[in-house]
Structure formats: structure tokens, C-alpha cells
Curated annotation (Swiss-Prot):
Residues 135-437, 480-574 form a coiled coil. The coiled coil domain mediates homodimerization. Homodimer. Interacts with microtubules via its N-terminus. This is Protein hook. The keyword Zinc does not apply. GO terms for molecular function: dynein light intermediate chain binding; microtubule binding; small GTPase binding. It comes from the Eukaryota. It holds the Pfam family HOOK_N. It comes from Drosophila simulans.
Length: 679
């Protein structure tokens, strides 16, 4: 099918093969490097395409290097355009420039055709154009017609007037020898017959004139002899003309007449010779014309036979067009069938993918359900851990506080011991003076001071009461959600810390009041230390409060993120389910368009399957997969049956020798249901 498309290219290539070039120029690959084209241009116009310019064209080591080809072709086309604009005064603005990259890379025939068209224009417009035109005239008529069409397309783009504008017309006149040959032969034969008739008439007239001149010459000779015999001659008027002697008037006149007659005789003889030569030439022309007429008669007979063959070929061409149209329709139908097959395959693959995605989404949903339970467990564990942490922290604070109290008591006891030792020394000195009553009073006083220091503080009771309330509140709020519990726990911890801070402040105040009654210096140092410790505890509690708040916010963010992910997964599952249903509906429509019988069977099977699925929704995963595989296999069976039916139709259509309408009237062969069931 590529030859009719590039008919002009092959005609131009046949003309280019007639040139005597050193470089190979037989096919498109040899022309794609531009070497043969450059040599041809140098041969056409060596004054414009000089040898120095030709040496710039790289002939060796080009091979398959398309960049070197591209550079050669650029040089050739630029020089050709310069030659057209500067030398021929042509404007090629309307002529589409050939794509050199496609020629260099792919040897494109369409672009080579335009490049050869430009080279042809250089050939028929150069100084030696007549020789190249005669070479073109020696080619076949079909090639001449294509070359003439190429020149006409090239001249249609010319905008400046040039004296070589009639080249295409001369080629067109020389190439019109097809069906008009018979008329030309008839006209030439009539013209030659008319010429022969006119030459024969001229010959007869000249022969008559020759005989008349000969008779007149004979009469003159007789008259001259008679006049020489008689001395005197009487004229027409009766007057004597005198003797014919040399020097006389009569003699001179007769002499003059004789000279005139001789000149006329010579002229008549020259004319006779000319006529004889013309007659011989006319005879030879007549023979040539007769031979030409015979040749033309033979050519007219050949033309008639060729006309008959053309008519036969025309009829066969019409039949071929009809067959090609039918073939195109069949090809389109086959392409549509292949497209439908591809679409069905794609839909099957998509349905399988959707089934896999649905299974994966189900697994993800189950996994997320498990993770949901785990998250709830983790929430409960976090709450328990927070409760334990609060209990341990409160215990730690209590122990630290008790430790500090015990240390203070120990210091107080040590001081009391020192004072007692001093008093003992004093009492030993005054043992003689003071008796047992004083000793008992002093011991009672010391016992009261010690008992006062060892009494439990009110803050410990308040802390115990607050812890009990905290535990009761935690137990009462155990039924709320995880986030609310976390927030409540954080708030409770804040309240506990605030209450502890309050109690610490109250204790500081109580201790400050107690310090006023005891030794001020020692109490201030002890209470200063306790105040510092309580401030540090306050800072630690505030830090713990902030950490608890941040942990609660982070846990809340994680829970919200997990909930959003779960909702997004559920939406994706719904979207993929809808897409799967749409694809199933499209597959049903395609199968209905292919064969409604299979489609009805498929609808019934799909309805049954859907009813079974509705009844048995909580089926295991493997049974669902088996049912989906069975439905896809049933779809594939329907497609295969339809394909076999179409193949049998095509085989019947291609094998039978009937007409297209007769084949269309026949009923399509149908396969039995038993054959389909056996498959």
C-alpha cells in the first residue's frame, strides 16, 4: 500500500537514477546522506554549486550517523534555496520546506519527495535544461505525468516572472500521447493527403508551363531561322523592317528578345530543377508520411486495444474498490471486536483487582477492629497506670514529708538530749540542794515538750482525707469514655496538686505560728528548709501537671487520628464496592451487546448469586472468593462462545463465493447449547 502513496517519489527516484553520478543513488537510504544530491547539483550548475562547495559535503564516514547526514542535508537545502532566490528569482515561501531530521533519522519518503522536487526544479532551469528535458521525455508516460505534476506544484509557488516558465507546459505537450494519439494520427494523415494533392497539382501546372515554354522556344527558333533566310521582313503594319544584319536595329531588337528568352528559359529550367527536387522531396515525404500513417494506424489499433484493456481494468478497479470497502468494513468490525475483547479482559482484570481490594479492605477492617479493642485496653491500662502513678506519687510525697518530720523530730530530740545533759550536770551540782520533787517536775516538763513535738499534724489527716475522696471520685467516674477519663484524670491531678499546695501553705502558716511560741532562731532555720522543700515540691507538681496535660492532649490526638483513618478506610471500601458494581454493570451491558442470550443467562446467574449472597451474608472468605471466581469464569465462557460464533461467521463469509448482499441475507450459524455446556 506504500507505493500509491509515494508514487511521485518513486517517479522522481527513477528520473534521478538516470543521472551519471559517482555516489550511490538507487534508494532512499543512499539519498539520505545528501552526497548524491550534492553531486547532482554540481552537475546541473557548476558555477553556483562549485567544487569547493562540494568538498564541504562529507562523503566518507557518514554511515548511520544521522548528525552528519543532517549537516550535509542542511548545506544542500540552504544552497538550493539560495540558488532559487538568487539565480532563478524564485520565491519558495509557499513551498513547504522538507523536514531534514526525519530524512536523516528515518529516511522519510514524503520529505525526500519534496527535496527531489527542488532538485528537479534546478535541473529543468539550469543552462543544460534541454538535455535533461529530453531525458525526461524518454521515460515512461506515467513517470512523465508524475514529474510534470511535481514541476507544476513547484511552479505554482513561484512569485517572480522567469523566462523558463513554459517547461512544465512543454513537458505536458510532449507527454500527452495517451488517448489523444488516434485523433492526432487522423489529422496528420488528412494533412499529408492534402499536401500530396497540392504538390501533384503544382507538378501538373509546372509541366504544362514547361511544355508551353518549349513550344514557344521552338516557335522562336523557327522564326529566327526564317528571318535569317529572308533579307527583308515586312512587319505587321506592312512596313519593311530591313535586313537582319549585325548592328542593325532589327538585329539588336531580335538579339534583345533572344536574351530575354534565354533568361526566361534559364529561369524555367531552374524552376524545373527546383520543382524536380521538390517533387523528389515530396515523394520521400510522402513515403515517410505513408510509413508514419501505417505506424499511426498500428498505434491507433494498439490504442484501441489499450482502451479495451483500460475499460476492463476500470471495471476490475471498481470491483476492487467495492471489495476494499467491504474489507475495510470487515476490518473495522474485527477491530471493534478486538476492542470489545480487550475491554472485557480489562474489566475482568479490574473486577479481580476489586475483589482483591475488597478482601484486603475486609482484612484491614478486621485488623482495625482488633486495634480498636487494643486501643480501648491501652486506654484502660493508661488510666490504671495514671492512678498507680498518682497513688505512688502521693505515697512518695507522704513518705518524704514524714521523713522530713522525723528528721525534724530527731533534731529536736537531739537538742532536748543536749539540754537534758546540761541540766543533769546542773542537777548533779545542785543534788544536795534540790530533792526528788524538783527532779520530777523537771522530768514532767521535759515529757510534756516531747509529747507536744511528737503529736501528728493536721496536714497528714487532710492529705489522707483528700486521697480517699480522690479514689472515690475515680471509682465513680469509671464508666465514661477513654478521652473523658484521661481529661478527668488530668484535671483531678491538677486539683490534687492544688489541694496539696493549699495544705502545704496551711502547714507553712501553722508552722510559722508554732515557731513564734518556740525558739525563734532554730525554728526559723527549720521552717525555712521546710518552706524550700515545699516550694520544690510545688514546682515538681506543676511540672507533673503540665506533663499530664500534654500526655492527655497527645492521646486525644492519636485517638482522633485513628478514628479518622478508620472512617477513611470505611469510605474507601464503600467507593470500591460502588466501582465494582459499576464495572459489573458495564460488563453486563457489553455482554448484552455481544449476545443477548448469554446476557440473559448471565443476569439470571448473577441474580441467583446476589440472592444467595443476601441470604448467606456471614459466609467465610474462601466461599465468597470461590463464588466470584465462578462468576468470572462464567463471563469468560460467554465471551469465548461469542468469539467462536463470530469466527465461524467470518469463516463462512470469507470461504463462500457469493455476493455481499446474499451473505448478509443468510442466517448466522448458531451453536447448540449442548456444545456450550460441554465447554
Amino acid at each position: 500500500m506504500s507505493a500509491p502513496k509515494n508514487e511521485m517519489y518513486y517517479s522522481l527516484l527513477e528520473w534521478f537514477k538516470t543521472l551519471n553520478l559517482n555516489a550511490p543513488h538507487a534508494d532512499a537510504e543512499s539519498l539520505a546522506d545528501g552526497v548524491a544530491l550534492a553531486q547532482a547539483l554540481n552537475q546541473f550548475a557548476p558555477e553556483s554549486f562549485t567544487d569547493a562547495w562540494l568538498s564541504k559535503i562529507k562523503a566518507s564516514a557518514v554511515g548511520s550517523n544521522w548528525r552528519l547526514r543532517m549537516s550535509n542535508l542542511k548545506k544542500v537545502t540552504q544552497s538550493v534555496y539560495d540558488y532559487y532566490s538568487d539565480v532563478l528569482n524564485y520565491s519558495l515561501s509557499d513551498f513547504s520546506k522538507p523536514d531534514l531530521q526525519r530524512i536523516a533519522e528515518k529516511c522519510d519518503l514524503g520529505e525526500l519527495e519534496r527535496l527531489l522536487q527542488l532538485v528537479l526544479g534546478c535541473a529543468v532551469n539550469c543552462a543544460e535544461k534541454q538535455s535533461y528535458i529530453t531525458e525526461i521525455m524518454c521515460l515512461e508516460e506515467e513517470l512523465q505525468a508524475n514529474i510534470m505534476r511535481a514541476l507544476q506544484e513547484l511552479e505554482a509557488t513561484r512569485q517572480a516572472s522567469t523566462p523558463e516558465g513554459g517547461v512544465a507546459s512543454s513537458l505536458s505537450r510532449g507527454s500527452r500521447t495517451g488517448l489523444l494519439d488516434s485523433k492526432a494520427v487522423q489529422e496528420d494523415r488528412d494533412a499529408l493527403a492534402q499536401k500530396c494533392f497540392e504538390t501533384e497539382k503544382k507538378m501538373l501546372l509546372l509541366i504544362d508551363e514547361k511544355t508551353n515554354l518549349q513550344q514557344e522556344l521552338h516557335k522562336l527558333q523557327q522564326e529566327f531561322a526564317r528571318l535569317e533566310q529572308h533579307s527583308t521582313v515586312i512587319g505587321d503594319d506592312g512596313v519593311s523592317l530591313g535586313p537582319v544584319q549585325t548592328g542593325s536595329v532589327r538585329y539588336n531588337e531580335l538579339r534583345r528578345q533572344l536574351d530575354l528568352l534565354k533568361e526566361e528559359l534559364l529561369q524555367s529550367e531552374g524552376a524545373r530543377e527546383d520543382l524536380k527536387i521538390k517533387a523528389q522531396q515530396q515523394d520521400t515525404d510522402l513515403l515517410h508520411m505513408q510509413m508514419r500513417i501505417e505506424e499511426l494506424m498500428k498505434s491507433s489499433a494498439e490504442v484501441t486495444t489499450l482502451k479495451d484493456e483500460v475499460d476492463v481494468l476500470r471495471e476490475s478497479n471498481d470491483k476492487l474498490k467495492i471489495c476494499e470497502a467491504q474489507l475495510d468494513t470487515y476490518k473495522k468490525k474485527l477491530e471493534d471486536y478486538n476492542d470489545l475483547k480487550k475491554q472485557v479482559k480489562i474489566l475482568e482484570e479490574r473486577s479481580a483487582d476489586y475483589v482483591q481490594q475488597n478482601a484486603q479492605f475486609e482484612e484491614d477492617a478486621k485488623r482495625y477492629a482488633n486495634t480498636k479493642g487494643q486501643v480501648e485496653l491501652f486506654k484502660k491500662e493508661i488510666q490504671d497506670l495514671h492512678a498507680k502513678l498518682d497513688a505512688e506519687s502521693s505515697k512518695n510525697v507522704k513518705l518524704e514529708f514524714d521523713n522530713k518530720n522525723l528528721e525534724g523530730k530527731n533534731l529536736a530530740l537531739q537538742r532536748a538530749k543536749d539540754s537534758l545533759l546540761k541540766e543533769r550536770d546542773n542537777l548533779r551540782e545542785a543534788v544536795d540542794e534540790l530533792k526528788c520533787g524538783q527532779l520530777s517536775s523537771s522530768t514532767a516538763l521535759t515529757g510534756t515538750t516531747v509529747s507536744r513535738e511528737l503529736q501528728p499534724s493536721a496536714t497528714v489527716e487532710k492529705l489522707q482525707r483528700l486521697e480517699a475522696e480522690n479514689k472515690a471520685l475515680r471509682e465513680g467516674q469509671g464508666g465514661q469514655t477513654a478521652l473523658a477519663q484521661l481529661l478527668d484524670d488530668a484535671n483531678k491531678r491538677c486539683e490534687n496538686l492544688r489541694e496539696q499546695l493549699k495544705t502545704a501553705n496551711e502547714r507553712i502558716l501553722s508552722l510559722s505560728h508554732a515557731s513564734q511560741s518556740d525558739d525563734p532562731i532554730l525554728k526559723e532555720s527549720e521552717f525555712g528548709k521546710q518552706i524550700k522543700q515545699l516550694m520544690e515540691l510545688n514546682e515538681q507538681k506543676t511540672l507533673q501537671l503540665e506533663e499530664a496535660v500534654t500526655q492527655s492532649t497527645s492521646l486525644q490526638c492519636k485517638v482522633t487520628q485513628l478514628e479518622t483513618n478508620l472512617s477513611a478506610r470505611e469510605q474507601e471500601i464503600l467507593v470500591y464496592d460502588a466501582k465494582y458494581r459499576k464495572c459489573v454493570e458495564k460488563a453486563k451491558e457489553v455482554i448484552k451487546s455481544i449476545d443477548p442470550r448469554i446476557a440473559s443467562a448471565l443476569d439470571a446467574s448473577v441474580l441467583e448469586k446476589s440472592a444467595d449472597l443476601v441470604e448467606e451474608e456471614p459466609k467465610p472468605k474462601m466461599s465468597v472468593m470461590e463464588e466470584q471466581l465462578m462468576t468470572s469464569a462464567f463471563y469468560r465462557l460467554g465471551v469465548n462462545a461469542q468469539r467462536d460464533a463470530i469466527d465461524s461467521k467470518l469463516a463462512i463469509l470469507m470461504g463462500s463465493g457469493q455476493t455481499f448482499l446474499a451473505r448478509q441475507r443468510q442466517s448466522a450459524p448458531r451453536k447448540s447449547l449442548s456444545a456450550m455446556k460441554s465447554k
